[in-house]
Amino acid sequence: IKGEIIKDNTYIDNGTDCQYEIDLVSNRTHPDNFPFSIWAKLMREVIVEKSTALMDKAPSGGIMELRRTISFHLKQFRNMETEPEQIITGAGTEYLYNLIIQLLGHNKVYAVENPGYKKVAQIYKSNNVLCEYIPVDNSGIIVEELEKHKADVAHISPSHHYPTGVVTPVSRRYEILSWASRKEGRYIIEDDYDSEFRLAGRPIPALQSIDVMERVIYINTFAKSLAPTIRISYMVLPKSLIGVFYNKLGFYSCTVSNFEQYTLARFIKDGYFEKHINRMRNYYRN
């Protein structure tokens, strides 16, 4: 590009070559956008007020204070009716994907979106389960292809498909739920990654919020909304799977430290998370 950028970012066309540096990395948070001072304040409060609890072993699903806070947050922002007992926390969605495979079984056919997030398919394949690639159109995953490939579990991102950005309309969401209800043992993994940053149009309800057959396992993470290094993710199990989960996988230790869990719980409960999301929406719009 011919020209130069002077100190106040004004562009002047003076015939000289000018280079721009553009960061296209999708999972990075600029240091200026993270509320370090607030996070540090809450960490100090947790150390003082939760010193005994910090030394206790957390339940395998995570500390109840954070799970209650997430449950309330989901009701307020995703119209989801959940009980804290349905929520399982873990260090990253990859860890939760592995738990789901062990929970539902290695003998099922797992369907992923094509195109889609490459790591999801890699995780399924590394667990030696059959993984089918299902095409996506302008409304999301194609339901007829799920039947054609004899899928048992559909792993989808209906609120913000990666990499196309497609948002699955309500009509298609009901089609997907209908597919899951037609055969016993079918489930939908709703990956709601990045749903906080819907910048245009009216919000669409989470698939889990309109699921009356208990076939949706909802997954989300704070890696995008806060920072990728804050490895706190969670899933919401159907009530019918809670007992199965603890009978099969209750021996696992929670992979998120008590310290981070208590800090995040306060960050959400005290309203800082909502303020942060609103500020980041404005940042991304501009």
Go through each PLM region and give its residues.
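N-terminal basic, amphipathic alpha-helical segments
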Residues: 1-44, 250-257, 265-268, 274-286
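Short aromatic-enriched loop/helix-cap "lid" or pocket-rim segments at secondary-structure transitions
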Residues: 34-38, 199-202, 229-231
